[in-house]
From Swiss-Prot:
Pfam families reported in the protein's UniProt record: Sulfotransfer_1
Protein name per Swiss-Prot or TrEMBL: Heparan sulfate glucosamine 3-O-sulfotransferase 1
Annotated Gene3D superfamilies: P-loop containing nucleotide triphosphate hydrolases
Gene for this chain: Hs3st1
GO function terms (MF aspect): [heparan sulfate]-glucosamine 3-sulfotransferase activity
GO cellular component: Golgi apparatus; Golgi lumen
Organism from which the protein derives: Rattus norvegicus
Disulfide bonds: C260-C269
Membrane-crossing residue ranges in chain numbering: none
Glycan-modified residues: N52, N196, N246, N253
Catalyzed reaction equations: alpha-D-glucosaminyl-[heparan sulfate](n) + 3'-phosphoadenylyl sulfate = 3-sulfo-alpha-D-glucosaminyl-[heparan sulfate](n) + adenosine 3',5'-bisphosphate + H(+)
Lineage summary: Eukaryota, Metazoa, Chordata, Craniata, Vertebrata
């Protein structure tokens, strides 16, 4: 009976097929010319339910970004809360066609088993900068709570470059110096993807076409690095979670140079790939980066009604 009910729920919640560049939503959009398909979970598979009564639930909260903004740290720290069940991996359901085409039934199988009172959370930082994702998430759940962690756009660019650089080095592949990617004919290379990902104003406009600002909580990633506890408290309040995480759950690791977690007497830190040192960059190039982001940052501050301590 539970599985039959689940099939009915998924029929209602099945995401709609949308174009890569969706039009603004209007009256009757959800009813006009949409292809739906029934998702049935066979009774003999046990998919979506466990013998202990826990089930796999579609997420009620998604960490949508930003890449190299601190999404993994946010998820790990939020997972300290007993009422949170987090998906371990980046699911890439709403931005990868090979996943999205498989429907909500597939998406559900990527979620952790959880108790009815728990909040299921997944994080895929690429969602924030993907034009098609906001409408797709809205089609699944228009009242979903979204988390967005942002840091200084210039610092985020350097972190973005550093990650790709290390990925190439691990595969023994060459990768150009950051100056070669950032500069072209004496000017900033605005076609460099890492720059585009830091234009928060442009991406946020797309999300606000489908969700009110009150449904998107912005975590200050720079403050989160310096002192995570106050930012986590704000997230708890936004998600209407009881205050269970406390300052004793965090300690500063001098060797690593960032905060680690303490849970039930056990200490653990993020993967060694987190918190890598950035390459040395010419101060003049940094000045160009700061100047490039100055006006977009002002527009973003006005859009969201708050300011951040960015260059």
């Amino acid at each position: 009976m539970t599985l039959l009910l689940l099939g009915a729920v998924l029929l209602v919640a099945q995401p709609q097929l949308v174009p890569s560049h969706p039009a603004a939503p209007g009256p009757g959009l959800k009813q006009q010319g949409l292809l739906r398909k029934v998702i049935i979970l066979p009774e003999d598979t046990g998919e979506g339910a466990a013998t202990n009564g826990s089930t796999q639930q579609l997420p009620q909260t998604i960490i949508i970004g930003v890449r190299k903004g601190g999404t993994r740290a946010l998820l790990e720290m939020l997972s300290l809360h007993p009422d949170v069940a987090a998906a371990e991996n980046e699911v890439h359901f709403f931005d990868w066609e090979e996943h999205y085409s498989q429907g909500l039934g597939w998406y559900l199988t990527q979620m952790p088993f959880s108790s009815p009172h728990q909040l299921t959370v997944e994080k895929t930082p690429a969602y924030f900068t993907s034009p098609k994702v906001p409408e797709r998430i809205h089609s699944m759940n228009p009242t979903i709570r979204l988390l967005l962690i942002l840091r200084d756009p210039s610092e985020r660019v350097l972190s973005d470059y550093t990650q790709v650089l290390y990925n190439h080095l691990q595969k023994h592949k060459p990768y150009p110096p950051i100056e070669d990617l950032l500069m072209r004919d004496g000017r900033l290379n605005v076609d460099y993807k890492a720059l585009n990902r830091s234009l928060y104003h442009a991406h946020m406009l797309n999300w606000l076409r489908f969700f009110p600002l009150g449904h998107i909580h912005i975590v200050d990633g720079d403050r989160f690095i310096r002192d995570p506890f106050p930012e986590i408290q704000k997230v708890e309040r936004f998600l209407k979670l009881s205050p269970q995480i406390n300052a004793s759950n965090f300690y500063f690791n001098k060797t690593k140079g960032f905060y680690c977690l303490r849970d039930s007497g056990k200490d653990r830190c993020l993967h060694e790939s987190k918190g890598r040192a950035h390459p040395q960059v010419d101060p003049k190039l940094l000045d160009k980066l700061h100047e490039y982001f100055r006006e977009p940052n002002k527009k973003f501050f006005k859009l969201v009604g708050r300011t951040f301590d960015w260059h």
